[in-house]
UniProtKB/Swiss-Prot annotation:
Its EC number is 2.1.1.297. Keywords: Methyltransferase, S-adenosyl-L-methionine, Transferase. Belongs to the protein N5-glutamine methyltransferase family. PrmC subfamily. This is Release factor glutamine methyltransferase. It comes from the Bacteria. Signal peptide: none annotated. S-adenosyl-L-methionine binds at G122, T123, G124, T125, G126, D145, W173, N188. Methylates the class 1 translation termination release factors RF1/PrfA and RF2/PrfB on the glutamine residue of the universally conserved GGQ motif. GO terms for biological process: methylation; translational termination. Disulfide bonds: none annotated. It is an enzyme of class 2 (transferase). GO terms for molecular function: nucleic acid binding; protein-(glutamine-N5) methyltransferase activity; protein-glutamine N-methyltransferase activity. It comes from Shewanella oneidensis (strain ATCC 700550 / JCM 31522 / CIP 106686 / LMG 19005 / NCIMB 14063 / MR-1).
Amino acid sequence: MADQSCIAEALQWAYVQLAASSESAHLDAEVLLLYCLNKNRAYLYTWPEKALSVEQWKRFQQMVQRRQQGVPVAHIVGEREFWSLPFIVNDTTLIPRPDTEILVESALNLPLESNAKVLDLGTGTGAIALALASERAAWQITAVDKVEDAVALAKANRTNLKLEQVEILQSDWFSAVTSHDFDLIVSNPPYIDEADEHLHQGDVRFEPQSALTAADEGFADLYYIAKTARDYLKPNGYILLEHGFEQAVKLRAKLIELGYQNVATVRDFGSNDRCTMGKWMGLIGI
């Protein structure tokens, strides 16, 4: 293997290396090379003949080899874009997914006051809470996670994005939450069945299982949040939960059973059921 390469050759080499192990080999190669060069995508195709330095080429090869081993690109570069914001990521929590932007969009579309109080449960990187804060500066947002390292990561992203108005706490779901007058409670909790065979495939192998799986065929945390949230929502407050595409029917039924009204599901960019919401009137004690 040569000690140096130009951009076009490096991309082609990386694609060949990754084609058998990644469904997004072209994109992976681009993202990794952009990170090595600290350039934007246009640069790659404007200057395909530009030579990489010996150090850049060596580093790029090492990163491609890690990707061949299945390590997520976001973990290799330490960053993932979400809601057009750069988030620091690591292996202590989930990598933000594009589908979760539907939850953010749905929250922003709710008829809330300009100073609404919002709680984000299981915040992980802080992606949902910080994306909302970037759009609604006056919202009073609290984000919680039970994992100490995840809380530290969310705080680092808060500082990096200059969104210090967001309160971030360590809390096992509601355990450290003292307010009981939220206008909106959002969560992307663990919702994958513990027996799901896909947990042993692809990028999720490198993410914490505790952030992915839940008991009761993946419904345990969804049901717990839906039930407990009623004690933390003000009358006419909303709950908004992300879930698996096959869980919408049962989750809607559970929300209705618990006394929520105006229960509805929103589909993601792939037309899969992704988020379900309900309005808590504060009138039924169940």
